[in-house]
């Protein structure tokens, strides 16, 4: 009962409230006015919210630089229409896709995007401009090659210096015992013994010795390989060569007779015969074998006459040549030594070259390029052969017949030279005469005094007449002698 009583009280309260509510709307017109005002206020509020909210622009870009602009807040796309749009999209998705409907759509240029914004271009950076180690491979190779060249230069130069010093230390005692002066560099007016080698460059060392009987002096030249040059090192890998020691002894004129003689390897003698002036003129025959004198097959002989060969090939000389044949390149004795042939652009030279009585030795250093300082000791016996050859050249003398034959050979060489150069000498004399005449004519033409100019012309004419008369007298004398 208590619950029922409570329920009745609630109904009474609710009924009183509803009656108070409907008392405000006594007639129908009041209700209409209330409704219109309420909806008008609602519409004003909606319009204010639409105008106050700014339009938001969304720009989307795809990979082909196409721009799409979407505007939010337009009247035709209100929030109330979203549900209808969703239903329409659902219907369109279910419909089949028609290719002809969108034909030419993608080919249309999008003018709105080009007006609003410039197209974005992506520049491809070349590979050689990128910051990576691959971009500097050429520089790396150049730096590596430069470092290799510098290292090879230092190592090769130091090795040649060590080899030269090892040779000098080995031969110094022998040289000082046979020569008063060892190691003159030529910088002082007076000859002084420096006791050291003179370095010409990184692979050539010189040593001058003098102060011995029967010779003016001895020049020793150590010709090492160009170990400081990387390209030369690479070339020697394909064709090995040896270091060489060249010794040139200049004899006194009264201490050596007139002859030309050479012994050495066949290849070296053929080359010397083509290059050297004296061997090509006085030893025209091919190199002959030295088996007759007990020489190995690797050595051959070039000689002006047989008497010279018999006199030079004594027991001790044969001993040196036989035991050290692998180190001997050539041995060259000559009283007509003038060096290599003189090659001129315009024919033969007009004058015979100056000659010196010379002993020339060329030795190969053991090792075929792979030389060590200890290998220089093997060349010491060859220096003893040089000292012996100096004394041998002083003692050796040709007999009467050999002397006459040698003189005939030298006269023949001189005559052949004069015949070869006769035309050239005539041309040179003719050019000198023409130059003299031209200078005389210029002097006459430059003379301002007419009387003096006339006298000079008459004097020149008289000289020409006298020359013609002399030529005619010579021709008459020749005819009389012929008769």
From Swiss-Prot:
This is PAT complex subunit CCDC47. Residues 450-483 form a coiled coil. Residues 1-20 form the signal peptide. GO terms for biological process: endoplasmic reticulum calcium ion homeostasis; ER overload response; ERAD pathway; multi-pass transmembrane protein insertion into ER membrane; osteoblast differentiation; post-embryonic development; protein insertion into ER membrane. It comes from Homo sapiens (Human). Residues 105-118, 430-472 have a biased composition (Basic and acidic residues). Belongs to the CCDC47 family. Residues 473-483 have a biased composition (Basic residues). Keywords: Chaperone, Coiled coil, Disease variant, Endoplasmic reticulum, Glycoprotein, Membrane, Signal, Transmembrane, Transmembrane helix. It comes from the Eukaryota. Residues 156-483 are lumenal. InterPro entries: CCDC47. GO terms for molecular function: calcium ion binding; protein folding chaperone; ribosome binding; RNA binding. One of its GO terms (cellular component) is rough endoplasmic reticulum membrane. It is linked to Trichohepatoneurodevelopmental syndrome: An autosomal recessive complex multisystem disorder characterized by woolly or coarse hair, liver dysfunction, pruritus, dysmorphic features, hypotonia, and global developmental delay. Residues 60-104 have a biased composition (Acidic residues). The keyword Chaperone applies. Component of the PAT complex, composed of WDR83OS/Asterix and CCDC47. The PAT complex is part of the multi-pass translocon (MPT) complex, composed of three subcomplexes, the GEL complex (composed of RAB5IF/OPTI and TMCO1), the BOS complex (composed of NCLN/Nicalin, NOMO and TMEM147) and the PAT complex (composed of WDR83OS/Asterix and CCDC47). The MPT complex associates with the SEC61 complex. Interacts with VCP, HSPA5, DERL1, DERL2 and SELENOS. Residues 21-135 are cytoplasmic. The chain crosses the membrane at residues 136-155.
């Amino acid at each position: 009962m208590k619950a029922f009583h409570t329920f009745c009280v609630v109904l009474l309260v609710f009924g009183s409230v509803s009656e108070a509510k409907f008392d405000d709307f006594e007639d129908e017109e009041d209700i209409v006015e209330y409704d219109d005002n309420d909806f008008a206020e609602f519409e004003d509020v909606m319009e204010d919210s639409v105008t106050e909210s700014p339009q938001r622009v969304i720009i989307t870009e795809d990979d082909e630089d196409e721009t799409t602009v979407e505007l939010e807040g337009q009247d035709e796309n209100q929030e109330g229409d979203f549900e209808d749009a969703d239903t329409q999209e659902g219907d369109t998705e279910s419909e089949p896709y028609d290719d002809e409907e969108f034909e030419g759509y993608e080919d249309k240029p999008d003018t709105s995007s080009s007006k609003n914004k410039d197209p974005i271009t992506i520049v491809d950076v070349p590979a050689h401009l990128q910051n990576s180690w691959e971009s500097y491979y050429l520089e790396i190779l150049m730096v590596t090659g430069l470092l290799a060249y510098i290292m090879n230069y230092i190592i090769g130069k130091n090795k040649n210096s060590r080899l030269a010093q090892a040779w000098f230390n080995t031969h110094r005692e022998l040289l000082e015992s046979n020569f008063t002066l060892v190691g003159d560099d030529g910088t002082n007016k007076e000859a002084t013994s420096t006791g050291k080698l003179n370095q010409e460059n990184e692979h050539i060392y010189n040593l001058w010795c003098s102060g011995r009987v029967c010779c003016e002096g001895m020049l020793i030249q150590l010709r090492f390989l160009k170990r400081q040059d990387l390209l030369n090192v690479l070339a020697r890998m394909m064709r090995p060569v040896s270091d060489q020691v060249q010794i040139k002894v200049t004899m006194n004129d009264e201490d050596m007779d007139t002859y030309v003689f050479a012994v050495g390897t066949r290849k070296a003698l053929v080359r010397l015969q083509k290059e050297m002036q004296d061997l090509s003129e006085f030893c025209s025959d091919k190199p002959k074998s030295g088996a007759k004198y007990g020489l190995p097959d690797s050595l051959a002989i070039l000689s002006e006459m047989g008497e010279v060969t018999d006199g030079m090939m004594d027991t001790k000389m044969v001993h040196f040549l036989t035991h050290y044949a692998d180190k001997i390149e050539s041995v060259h004795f000559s009283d007509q030594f003038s060096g290599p042939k003189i090659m001129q652009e315009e024919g033969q030279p007009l004058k015979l070259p100056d000659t010196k009585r010379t002993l020339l030795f060329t030795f190969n250093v053991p090792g075929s390029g792979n030389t060590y300082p200890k290998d220089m000791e093997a060349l010491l016996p060859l220096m003893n052969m040089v000292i012996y050859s100096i004394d041998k050249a002083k003692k050796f003398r040709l007999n009467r017949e050999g002397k006459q034959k040698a003189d005939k050979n030298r006269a023949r060489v001189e005559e052949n030279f004069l015949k070869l150069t006769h035309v050239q000498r005539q041309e040179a004399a003719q050019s000198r005469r023409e130059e003299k005449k031209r200078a005389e004519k210029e002097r006459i033409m430059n003379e301002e005094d007419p009387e003096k100019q006339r006298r000079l012309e008459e004097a020149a004419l008289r000289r020409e007449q006298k020359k013609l008369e002399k030529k005619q007298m010579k021709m008459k004398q020749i005819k009389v002698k012929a008769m």
